[in-house]
Amino acid sequence: MSEAERKMQFLYALRSKGVTDKRVLSAMENIDRGPFIRGIFAERAYEDMPLPIACGQTISQPSVVGLMTQALKISPRDKVLEVGTGSGYQAAILSRLARRVYTLDRHSRLVREARTLFEEMNLTNITAITADGSYGLADQAPFDRILVTAAAEDPPSTLMEQLKVGGIMVIPVGQSDAVQHLIVVHKTEDGLEYDELRQVRFVPLLEGLGKDG
C-alpha cells in the first residue's frame, strides 16, 4: 500500500469513528504520526491503535486523539494547556488549531524528545515543560482549553481553577484498573457542566516527577 493510500485509509478510519470536524481532520492529515513512534512500532503509525512509547507511556489511538481534540472546539485565538505530553503527537495536533499550546509532562526524557520533534517540524507555538501536570501552569493561566491525557479519579481542582469561564476541559476520569470515562467539562459563570463522550483506557495521572533523567 502506498503512502497516499495509507493516509486515505487513516482519514477514513477517523471519520468512521466520529471525527468529522474539518479543521481537526486537516490537522491530523498534516501532522504525520510516524515521527512520534520509535522502533519496531513505527510501521504501525497509520493503524488506529495505541502504541507503547518510552517511560512506560503510550501514544493514544488516532481516533481518540481526534475525538478529544474535536470536543475541545478550539478556535484560532485559544491558549491551550495539555497535561501529559507523551510522544508530543497530541500537542502537535493542537498547535495546528490554537494560538498557543503549553504541554507538561513529568518525564523529562519525553519532554526533550518532543521538543526535538517540534523544532524539526517547525511547530513554534508549542512550549513543552517538565512539570507535575496535576498542578497545571499557574503563571500562564487562565487557559481557554485544557486537555488531560492521563486518567484522574476526579478532575483536579487546580486545573479547574486555571480554566477560563467559558472554557472547556477534556479529561479521562476513573481508576487506572477499571473502566474510565472521557469527560467534557464546560466552565460557566454558574459552575461546571459535564458531558460524557465514551469509555476509554488511559495511563493514570501521577503526582511528582518521573525518575527517567
UniProtKB/Swiss-Prot annotation:
The active site is at 60. Its main location: cytoplasm. Coiled coil: none annotated. One of its GO terms (biological process) is protein repair. It holds the Pfam family PCMT. CDD domains: AdoMet_MTases. The keyword Cell division does not apply. It catalyses: [protein]-L-isoaspartate + S-adenosyl-L-methionine = [protein]-L-isoaspartate alpha-methyl ester + S-adenosyl-L-homocysteine. It comes from the Bacteria. GO terms for cellular component: cytoplasm. Keywords: Cytoplasm, Methyltransferase, S-adenosyl-L-methionine, Transferase. It is found in: Cytoplasm. GO terms for molecular function: protein-L-isoaspartate (D-aspartate) O-methyltransferase activity. PROSITE patterns: PCMT (PS01279). Its EC number is 2.1.1.77. Belongs to the methyltransferase superfamily. L-isoaspartyl/D-aspartyl protein methyltransferase family. Catalyzes the methyl esterification of L-isoaspartyl residues in peptides and proteins that result from spontaneous decomposition of normal L-aspartyl and L-asparaginyl residues. It plays a role in the repair and/or degradation of damaged proteins. This is Protein-L-isoaspartate O-methyltransferase. The gene is pcm.
